[in-house]
Curated annotation (Swiss-Prot):
Protein species of origin: Aspergillus oryzae (strain ATCC 42149 / RIB 40) (Yellow koji mold)
Taxonomic lineage from the root: Eukaryota, Fungi, Dikarya, Ascomycota, Pezizomycotina
Cytoplasm found in the keyword field: yes
Gene Ontology molecular function: carbohydrate derivative binding; glucose-6-phosphate isomerase activity; monosaccharide binding
Keyword Isomerase listed: yes
Residues engaged in binding D-glucose 6-phosphate: G164, S165, S215, K216, T217, F218, T219, T220, Q359, E363, H394, K516
Subcellular location: Cytoplasm, Cytosol
HAMAP family: G6P_isomerase
Assembly and interaction partners: Homodimer.
Catalyzed reactions: alpha-D-glucose 6-phosphate = beta-D-fructose 6-phosphate
Protein name, per record: Glucose-6-phosphate isomerase
Length: 553
């Protein structure tokens, strides 16, 4: 474990504060490029994806960086023992110390079968056994060998889960839609709001629908409630409970609850306690992905992530792409006072990517207590948000360009589209915006330029853009399964780097629990008469108002 309590105690942190005062806050990006024609080459990095022999370019040059800045950030990472914590994670050590667990999602994508152990026991065999089960099952369903209770082919998959059991599979199946099985319908149900399950069932036929119940414990309230509603809907048509075995499978480790529900234990896909929910798309939770895009493509997805793992483990920090991304985030959060981080994919298939990254980033680093149990003396996890562009340009980009907040931004694009409409015309228009936005945010527009364009004096300040807004541009060849895997792993390791420097535990989520506990108490009060007890006046008033409006009073 790191031998420091507060990141502010590290000498590199103090040096960065001095550097920020003397240099960092005075960097004018436009001038930096004018002074150094090699700036792009110096501060961009290329990830070589050995899986499909493509490259992903990460351009960090439009960030508040000098060679000294990067050197000091690397020094900070070394003093914070980022490399040691990284190596401990990849060795299967219990770096999630509040839950006494390993953090070993990398083992799920160990397609090269490198030795990987937890507590002295190899995990490779068990991981491969689950993957083999996923392969066999997904191929049976996709081929039509697996049939419903009336011998019809499955054509609809409904994944019921919440949090990591939902966000990952939703995002990945949307991102890889071009690889999806023709004619297969996918629904993801997460919300306890009955509308979510009702809308999915409305579009489904019990004879051809397969339900994936995704819950490690099989006790998550939202998931089990939705699963029981789905079972009731199914049995209204199927009648015989023995038919459940052909239409329900469990992504869980709780065999007792799974079999009690009526699912055959042979149709149970397990995973280990060292798989955190927000990292679980690589595990059996990714079964919906394998069913939709096929197991071979799912394997490519895993392989792309492993390729980024290898880079993160082996590249020196100065060249380490996820480490640089994470260190820049610390630089902006703690030295420039940035509170947010924008991720804008210039790719409609990636429209759920920001929502996925929200959980990854904010559940991991939304912490205020260091590993030594002290309250942090600095800012931790930024608020991550985003929408696909160019849509986002017509909504919140106004604030990026002319607002008062510093919002470091990531723009993501692929050179090749899966849909080269009109000979690639749409893609070229998209690319022009991808390139123009980062340039515009950097260079801005001076009052003199506005005047030259003929604007009246009273409008000049309104049409002036200060510029000097930092961005990172990420340019892939094409959004393939392996490219997507690498991109997700990039953000995982970026998030890891942030948390390691801040000396917080990025792998628990106690903040999720308190609301759940209180909700159980209030749910009981909603089922009984009276106004409930022990609440503040606001909660009591709201409870009474809800009961009245819902005719429960």
């Amino acid at each position: 474990m790191p031998a420091f309590s507060q990141a502010t105690d590290l000498s590199a942190w103090k040096e960065l504060q001095e550097h920020h005062t003397a240099v960092g806050r005075n960097i004018v990006l436009k001038e930096a490029f004018e002074k150094d024609p090699q700036r792009f080459e110096k501060f961009s990095r290329t990830f070589k994806n050995t899986v499909d022999n493509s490259d992903i370019l990460f351009d960090f040059s439009k960030n508040f960086l000098t060679e000294e800045t990067l050197s000091l950030l690397v020094k900070l990472a070394k003093e914070a023992n980022v490399e040691e914590l990284r190596d401990a994670m990849f060795k299967g050590e219990h770096i999630n110390f509040t839950e006494d667990r390993a953090v070993y999602h990398a083992a799920l994508r160990n397609v090269s079968n490198e030795p990987m152990q937890v507590d002295g026991k190899s995990v490779v065999e068990d991981v491969n056994s689950v993957l083999e089960h996923m392969k066999e099952f997904s191929e049976q369903v996709r081929s039509g060998e697996w049939k419903g209770y009336t011998d019809k082919k499955i054509d609809t998959i409904i994944n019921i889960g919440i949090g990591g059991s939902d966000l990952g599979p939703v995002m990945v199946t949307e991102a890889l839609k071009p690889y999806g099985a023709p004619g297969m319908k996918l629904h993801f149900v997460s919300n306890i709001d009955g509308t979510h399950i009702a809308e999915a069932l409305k579009d489904s036929n019990p004879e051809t629908t397969l339900f994936l119940i995704a819950s490690k414990t099989f006790t998550t309230a939202e998931t089990t409630t939705n699963a029981n509603s789905a079972k009731k809907w199914f049995l209204e048509t199927a009648k015989d409970e023995s038919h459940i075995a052909k239409h329900f499978v469990a992504l869980s480790t709780n065999e007792a609850e799974v079999t009690k529900f009526g699912i055959d234990k042979k149709n149970m896909f397990g995973f280990e306690s060292w798989v955190g929910g927000r990292y679980s798309v690589w595990s059996a939770i990714g079964l919906s992905v394998a069913l939709y895009i096929g197991y071979d493509n799912f394997h490519q997805f895993l392989a792309g992530a492993q390729a980024m793992d290898k880079h993160f483990r082996e590249a020196p920090l100065e060249q380490n792409i996820p480490a640089i991304g994470g260190l820049l985030s610390v630089w902006y959060s703690d030295f420039f006072g940035a509170q947010t981080h924008l991720v804008a994919p210039f790719d409609q298939y990636l429209h759920r990517f920001p929502a996925y990254l929200q959980q990854l980033s904010m559940e991991s680093n939304g912490k205020a207590i260091t590993r030594s149990g002290e309250y942090v003396k600095y800012t931790t996890g930024p608020i991550l948000f985003g929408e696909p562009a160019t849509n986002a340009q017509h909504s919140f980009f106004q604030l990026l360009h002319q607002g008062t907040k510093l919002i470091p931004s990531d723009f993501i694009m692929a050179a090749e589209s899966h849909n080269p409409v009109e000979g690639g015309k749409h893609q070229r228009m998209l690319a022009s915006n991808f390139l123009a936005q980062s340039e515009a945010l950097m260079v801005g527009k001076t009052p003199e330029q506005v005047k030259t364009e003929g604007a009246p004096d009273n409008l000049v300040p309104h049409k002036t853009f200060l510029g000097n807004r930092p961005t990172t541009s990420i340019l892939a060849q094409k959004i393939t399964p392996s490219t997507l895997g690498a991109l997700i792993a990039y953000y995982e390791h970026l998030t890891f780097t942030e948390g390691a420097v801040w000396n917080i535990n990025s792998f628990d989520q106690w903040g999720v629990e308190l609301g759940k506990v209180l909700a159980k108490k209030i749910q009981q009060e909603l089922e009984t008469s009276g106004a409930g007890a022990g609440h503040d006046a606001s909660t009591s008033g709201l409870l009474a108002a809800f009961k009245q409006k819902a005719n429960l009073a």
